[in-house]
From Swiss-Prot:
The gene is atpA. It comes from the Bacteria. It is found in: Cell inner membrane. Produces ATP from ADP in the presence of a proton gradient across the membrane. The alpha chain is a regulatory subunit. InterPro entries: ATP_synth_asu-like_sf, ATP_synth_asu_C, ATP_synth_asu_C_sf, ATP_synth_F1_a_nt-bd_dom, ATP_synth_F1_asu, ATPase_a/bsu_AS, ATPase_F1/V1/A1_a/bsu_N, ATPase_F1/V1/A1_a/bsu_N_sf. This is ATP synthase subunit alpha.
Amino acid sequence: MQLNSNEIAELIKQRIEKFEVTSEARNEGTIMSVQDGIIRIHGLADCLQGEMVELPGNRYAIALNLERDSVGAVVMGPYADLQEGTKVKSTGRILEVPVGEKLLGRVVNTLGQPIDGKGPIEADGYEPVEKIAPGVIERQSVDQPVQTGYKSIDSMIPVGRGQRELIIGDRQTGKTALAVDAIINQKDSGIKCVYVAIGQKNSTISAVVRKLEEHGAMENTIVVAASASESAALQYLAAYSGCTMGEYFRDRGEDALIVYDDLSKQAVAYRQISLLLRRPPGREAFPGDVFYLHSRLLERAARVNADYVEKFTDGKVKGQTGSLTALPIIETQAGDVSAFVPTNVISITDGQIFLETDLFNSGIRPAVNAGVSVSRVGGSAQTKIIKKLGGGIRLALAQYRELAAFAQFASDLDESTRSQLEHGQRVTELMKQKQYKPMSVAQMAVSIYAVEKGFLKDVEIDKIMDFEESLQSFMASEYAELMAEIDKTGNYNDDIDAQLKAALEKFKQTQSW
């Protein structure tokens, strides 16, 4: 068979015409070293700070150090199989996480991937984990309450929507219990919740999720889990991921509550990353920007005005303000609030709830130290009835602590001192509350009214808890309308005062406690 040169030329032409070449401009680099989850990359010329770098096997690293000849990046996940000479690509994207209503009721990791075995999540969209906080003009003052369900907090240290209230204390003082109860109390308030677990045991996170499910609060809560077994990078970024998920609701004119449990472990994870990246250490070996680490996170919790919401939603939502309330948790060592991270977070937040080991061990739970706990903006958000009735609670407790210390040395006390001590004891006893038993505004008002108006003077100290329990069931059955009215309006006037007085006098006659 003889080949014709024209046929060959024609075949070659056809082949050339069919040949498709697709070219893409890609910024590639080479791994120079892998050490403790940190990779140094040569050749990524146009890399952004915080950019996602694509690694083999559908994994990513985040570029944190941009140096003259190399990029220092921290690997998100396992890194044992990465080797020198491996090619990596820059994506041109900052880390984003899924957001939306579909995340409610789910447990996700730092990257927003479900880890609860309930299938994939159809997100409404993706948002960057690092965002700039709303400016001064876009904010609105805090004047609506977040009810935690705790008498001691809602009466003395009230939290408002859009506030940052720090929960601080040693280990095993009930910090997580307080935050979880605050979430449980929001199940009927319309406030969406985000619980961010940083550096905790998987068993602890599982127990929290189980409790939220038991009390029906999981369906309006997102749990973001970065357990102790996760890499330092995922623990450091978890708080920002959770904040982005909470901001979704804030920016659409809804109210959200976020708990960071806890920021001490986040700071330790960030210190680990910074030291591995060879950044110069400062006080307690923390890097110089550890204040900025927490301030840029907590400033994103805010109450935004209706104009901001309208602009953000392109006019779909009008006349509604949005809020993100933050309850960051800090663990202290032997009550040392003057350490680096605690002082930083105290100065950033709008107040703190200080929990004490001695109070906790003596059976006063929640173990709130009323003397040093403060809410800097919550007073204007407090419910009227609680504000009016609860004014004397803090004073009674402060005087009681002072007099109790003095009374140890004095043998005979005058009548006024003795009555102050007895009143303080009763207030202290009444402020005790069991876990997972949050109270409504009306229930709190009744209890506080009883102690403030002297109805507990003739009740023995060890009977006060029983007295309160019987009183609440009596009010629920006999005065349901009054309780519903107080819950609905939160108002306090002469009529309500008279009704409460009559109710308590009637209850005292029953002697049913």
